[in-house]
């Protein structure tokens, strides 16, 4: 068997593209990428995963990378991961979400019960309808989509798709400088300093391009999942949850505080002077914590 490997898991008439890397005999950690990312997001960390005895399972949500485009929400993605774990013969595992992926990681912890041993959330947001002042972050696109929920999520997704098209076109057709420039307004000074590393920069650009291989449907439904009411309460997350943020994070730390207060078993860590991409610097810490939590 070649390693790392990529495979498709079939769910109904859809395929889910999966990347299986790290130590094949290690502690399984299922990774949920952020909005505008893909299963390739942690490729640079795969040698470290192997060293730390982590089996790193990453996948594209519907419409991203090589996964079939489809409407999706928090619980449907959790069921997709159940199918992935079944095909990989992984019974119990930890989950790790970055940014938008964090809410999907928490949904998996609720939906899959004891199969999820512990969860990690890097720069994740809480439910916008519950976190104080979260709606103050809305721009015109968010407001237009919000007014369509909960009655017409497909229309809300179309609103976001139209808004994301120019960015996706730049990512798909522009050179590396164009791609990085397109994200500058969304990142902190700490994040831009991290992207000054040529290896990290090239990897981030390749990951972004993979995310829009099929267009913007994946990003659009991710955005809808951010606006929509969560189909569970965070108090239903019974496993331990580790929360990581940068002090310069573009996810407001009010979300970190809300999650830390409302999750039954939460541990919050804020990295001083770091931003939304801080997880790329701290994989060693995060995986070490999740492995210990999984084995406890």
Language model feature labels by segment:
Residues 92-135:
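Conserved hydrolase catalytic core segment
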Residues 140-232:
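Alpha/beta-hydrolase
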Residues 237, 243-245:
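Short beta-strand/loop motif that positions the catalytic acidic residue
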Residues 265-296:
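Catalytic active-site module of serine/aspartate enzymes centered on a nucleophile-bearing elbow/loop
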């Amino acid at each position: 068997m070649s390693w790392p490997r990529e495979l498709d898991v079939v769910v109904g008439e859809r395929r889910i593209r999966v990347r299986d890397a790290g130590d094949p005999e290690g502690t399984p950690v299922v990774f949920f990428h952020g909005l505008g990312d893909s299963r390739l997001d942690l490729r640079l960390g795969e040698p470290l995963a192997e060293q730390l005895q982590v089996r790193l399972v990453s996948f594209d949500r519907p419409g991203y990378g090589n996964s079939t485009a489809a409407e999706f929400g928090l619980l449907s993605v959790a069921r997709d991961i159940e199918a992935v774990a079944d095909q990989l013969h992984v019974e119990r595992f930890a989950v790790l979400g970055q940014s938008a992926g964090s809410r999907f990681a928490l949904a998996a912890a609720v939906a899959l019960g004891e199969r999820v041993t512990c969860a990690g959330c890097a720069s994740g947001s809480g439910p916008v309808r519950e976190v104080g002042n979260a709606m103050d972050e809305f721009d015109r696109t968010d407001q237009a989509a919000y007014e369509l929920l909960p009655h017409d999520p497909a229309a809300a997704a179309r609103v976001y798709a139209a808004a994301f098209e120019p960015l996706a076109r730049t990512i798909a057709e522009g050179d590396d400088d164009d791609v990085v420039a397109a994200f500058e307004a969304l990142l902190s000074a700490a994040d831009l300093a991290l992207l000054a590393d040529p290896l990290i920069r090239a990897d981030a650009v390749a990951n972004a391009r993979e995310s829009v291989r099929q267009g913007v449907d994946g990003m659009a439904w991710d955005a809808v999942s951010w606006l929509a009411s969560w189909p569970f309460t965070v108090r239903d997350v019974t496993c331990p949850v580790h929360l990581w943020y940068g002090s310069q994070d573009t996810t407001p730390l009010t979300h970190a505080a809300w999650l830390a207060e409302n999750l039954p078993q939460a541990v919050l860590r804020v990295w001083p002077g770091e931003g939304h991409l801080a997880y790329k610097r701290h994989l060693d810490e995060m995986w070490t914590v999740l492995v210990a939590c999984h084995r406890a």
